[in-house]
UniProtKB/Swiss-Prot annotation:
It comes from Dictyostelium discoideum (Social amoeba). GO terms for biological process: mRNA transport; protein transport. InterPro entries: WD40/YVTN_repeat-like_dom_sf (IPR015943), WD40_repeat_dom_sf (IPR036322), WD40_rpt (IPR001680). Keywords: Membrane, mRNA transport, Nuclear pore complex, Nucleus, Protein transport, Repeat, Translocation, Transport, WD repeat. SMART domains: WD40. It comes from the Eukaryota. Component of the nuclear pore complex (NPC). Residues 152-188 are annotated as: Disordered. This is Nuclear pore complex protein nup43.
Length: 417
């Protein structure tokens, strides 16, 4: 029997993401971002989750203030270090590394020795910050000042792959602190970044925003390596990476899904699909069959498209309001999930014959990996009523847990699957 636990917060949490790694026990890490109307009161946090038979306990391990509403959030691993990457309504992309995880939340492969390098650096430079507890350390930040390409800049706060040369650390820190002050003075009001996505190889990330511009940034230093100013005449709502070179977007003009190839010499999309959706808020790409795209719209529709064609291959009118997020399951990519402003989360199973019922608990040898729209099963996930809009969700298949958040109820909900 599945369990549901509700955890109330003093903050309006609007983004939640798991770190998808194997942990030693029934634990996991997830991160959150907020959308407080007073922009200076927003923050990102890292949490620990302990999975139990009848309930789940969460614990906020560390947090840092963020200037602006958090519009998107990812957590990945770089050089054996968990890294939070996020975007804001004030036009910044930020990267924070997570240091000194409590022992019970250390995952397989986590290298805690990297933390000592920063402790040594602080001792040499007489910095009083302690790292006895879990902390978030700013690594890099980039400001979207795309109205003037010369103003697009990045601030690499800790680079050189954790250089052991302490003199280099000292020089780099002084230079970067000066750059940081200049950046903060000149770029606090960049164009809002509505969405970003990370390439499959984790070498780059792509951003879109209110300015209708697409930027491809190197994750190593957050320096733009490709810019296209002709994505849309208005704001772009969502972007997803198909491959390191292929990207899809949808914007305020609505109804259109555009496909881009940065290897092309043209600034125009290589393909455009006109949908029946009034406005698309969310996109998802099938992990194994990357020609299958899911789109969630403002009228509650969740439609599937095969980009080899110009029409939808499946339509679902399950929600009655904005579909904020979509995600294919990482463990069973033939399962799609959607969350909406109407307060519901749906699962769409496209497994051939739906062996094992299509649930998350299906054993690997019971899953038929064939994607089949004719074997679709749609189910509503049971959540507490009167929660309000479900703004974001994520699934950790290692512990069979779904986590979601609601800004209207200011809560996090953890559900076993």
């Amino acid at each position: 029997m599945s369990s549901v636990s509700v955890h109330y917060s003093t903050h309006k949490i609007n983004k939640v993401r798991f770190l998808n790694r194997n942990f030693h026990n029934d634990t996991s890490l997830f991160v959150t971002g907020t959308n407080h109307p007073v922009l200076s009161k927003n923050k990102i946090s890292v949490w620990g989750l302990e999975s139990r038979q009848n309930s789940d306990e969460i614990e906020e391990l560390a947090s840092v203030p963020i200037d602006g509403i958090v519009t998107e959030l990812k957590v990945i691993e770089i050089n054996n270090k968990p890294m939070i990457i996020g975007s804001t309504s004030k036009g910044s992309i930020f990267m924070y590394s997570i240091f000194n995880l409590p022992n019970k939340f250390e995952y397989i492969g986590y290298d805690g020795l990297l933390d000592k390098k920063y402790e040594n650096y602080n001792n040499i430079n007489n910095i009083n910050d302690t790292y006895d507890t879990c902390n978030l350390l700013k690594e890099r930040i980039w400001f979207n000042s795309s109205s003037n390409n010369n103003n697009v800049n990045s601030n690499n706060i800790n680079n050189n792959n954790y250089n052991n040369n302490n003199n280099n650390y000292n020089n780099n820190n002084n230079n970067n602190n000066n750059n940081n002050n200049n950046n903060n003075n000149n770029n606090n009001n960049g164009s809002c970044i509505n969405s970003f996505d990370i390439s499959y190889d984790q070498h780059s990330l792509v951003t879109v925003g209110n300015d209708g511009v697409m930027n491809l940034l190197s994750i190593e230093n957050l320096i733009p390596i490709y810019t296209n100013r002709y994505i849309d005449g208005l704001s772009v709502n969502v972007v997803k990476s198909i491959t390191s070179n292929q990207i899809i977007t949808s914007g305020e003009l609505g109804r259109y899904i555009k496909f881009w190839d940065i290897r092309s010499n043209s600034s125009q999309p290589v393909k455009t699909i006109k949908t029946q959706c009034p406005r698309i808020f969310s996109l998802a790409i099938h992990k194994d069959e990357q020609h299958i795209i899911a789109a969630g719209s403002s009228d509650g529709q969740v439609n599937l498209f095969d980009i080899r064609n110009d029409y939808s291959i499946d339509q679902n009118k399950t929600h009655n309001s904005n579909v904020w997020e979509l995600s294919f399951s990482k463990s069973n990519p033939n399962q799609l999930y959607s969350c909406s402003e109407d307060g519901f989360i749906y699962q769409y199973s496209y497994n051939k014959d739906n062996l094992g019922g299509g649930g998350m608990m299906t054993l690997p040898n019971q899953i038929n990996n064939t994607f089949d729209i004719y074997s679709k099963e749609v189910s509503l996930l049971q959540l507490p009523t009167s929660i309000g809009s479900i703004d974001s969700f994520d699934i950790n298949s290692n512990i069979n847990r779904l986590i979601c958040c609601s800004t209207s109820s200011q809560c996090l909900i953890v559900k076993s699957l």
